[in-house]
Amino acid sequence: MDTLLKTPNKLDFFIPQFHGFERLCSNNPYHSRVRLGVKKRAIKIVSSVVSGSAALLDLVPETKKENLDFELPLYDTSKSQVVDLAIVGGGPAGLAVAQQVSEAGLSVCSIDPSPKLIWPNNYGVWVDEFEAMDLLDCLDTTWSGAVVYVDEGVKKDLSRPYGRVNRKQLKSKMLQKCITNGVKFHQSKVTNVVHEEANSTVVCSDGVKIQASVVLDATGFSRCLVQYDKPYNPGYQVAYGIVAEVDGHPFDVDKMVFMDWRDKHLDSYPELKERNSKIPTFLYAMPFSSNRIFLEETSLVARPGLRMEDIQERMAARLKHLGINVKRIEEDERCVIPMGGPLPVLPQRVVGIGGTAGMVHPSTGYMVARTLAAAPIVANAIVRYLGSPSSNSLRGDQLSAEVWRDLWPIERRRQREFFCFGMDILLKLDLDATRRFFDAFFDLQPHYWHGFLSSRLFLPELLVFGLSLFSHASNTSRLEIMTKGTVPLAKMINNLVQDRD
């Protein structure tokens, strides 16, 4: 969806990618059963779907990294200049903060191993989110609305425009503003940060050391600089997607497919259907034309996450059922997104934003629009506490504490706690229960489901949202929410009571 990553964290369930992709994984229970001996029909079914998945992978081209044609002003390593802000990571979050802090006249150094590389991620956003940030020119395709297929014969039309982010345009726009504002760049990885009373020293893999008043970790899910002090056990959203040229597809080109939970494509694959009934996946699709489309099979959230191989097999079966013949794949992506889990230590010396700061929506996996909207909050706090002469005494730990406080105020922490409660319920739902949940969810007034997906509802409205969802749910779904949500609800209430400013 909008937070897709090609370079995930090191996860025990993650299978090596294309070129060395392990098609029959020895620790996959499904394939173990095949080797131990099952009926010949089952072996043929397995062989059929695996060969379909393999055929799909055979169309994936060699990865070509594309760089933007910019002359980046480099950080002068010979001068040992102390910068106001050192940003580790050149993704959307890092560049957004760099752009806004430098606009206020502060010195900024952006550190990234590939600062001109076009982001590999496919980002999808609601158009109103980018419109609010004056970024409509960074959408290359928009759809008048979206559709959700809950089940065969149950379809929800969502009259909320959706867009695909033009990665090249967004990064070009941000880089140009950074260059104009005087941001300096250093091409390297960061291995460590050493803190002193007033400043910090960023240690790079090439031996360069950069001193800064504030260090911002915008590296995504690496969690290498920002510290955590609680067990990290998130749910995982896992997906496999392709931008493909096809003979045709059955979807309306004026609407994107937000979720397709139908499973008729698995009728011929009982093993896959059984697994999908327990931990379901859905199709997310952005049709650009009648013969070009982005297709992605997604596990919304699971713990542990589904294996990439499993998702690719389900996708191959779905495309075959839909009659979608893939002629050529322009690019593919394998996505692993940690969701939920604890927030980092608040406060701490290194400031974070985006995935490293726990900003992924725990119930949906959304992050891009939320992070870009948070960039001005972080930037304004840094400028306010660092750039004003009256704040000269505010340095080091005190300065970072104020920035963290602005990024994660109590109302945002309470909001996130509610979203984690939602994730904990989703983790317990099988396919039928998931369908019932989203059948009720998308029947809510648009204000509520819009606000939930875009992180615009805060605790008072979230309580109304929860009651409204419960009232729209079927009796079966209400019973499921009550029985499976009791422990997560108690956990949420306990965390809310303990969390005070």
Curated annotation (Swiss-Prot):
Recorded GO cellular component terms are: chloroplast
**What UniProt keywords apply to this chain's record, in alphabetical order?**
Acetylation, Carotenoid biosynthesis, Chloroplast, Isomerase, NAD, Plastid, Stress response, Transit peptide
Which EC number(s) does the record attach to this protein?
5.5.1.19
Question: What GO terms describe the biological role, i.e. biological process, of this protein?
Answer: carotenoid biosynthetic process
Q: Where does NAD(+) bind?
A: 85-113
| More info | Plants overexpressing LYC1 exhibit improved tolerance to salt stress.
User: Which purpose does this protein serve, as stated in its record?
Assistant: Involved in carotenoid biosynthesis. Catalyzes the double cyclization reaction which converts lycopene to beta-carotene and neurosporene to beta-zeacarotene. Major lycopene beta-cyclase that does not seem to be involved in neoxanthin synthesis. Involved in salt tolerance improvement by increasing synthesis of carotenoids, which impairs reactive oxygen species (ROS) and protects the photosynthetic system under salt stress.
The molecule here is called: Lycopene beta cyclase, chloroplastic
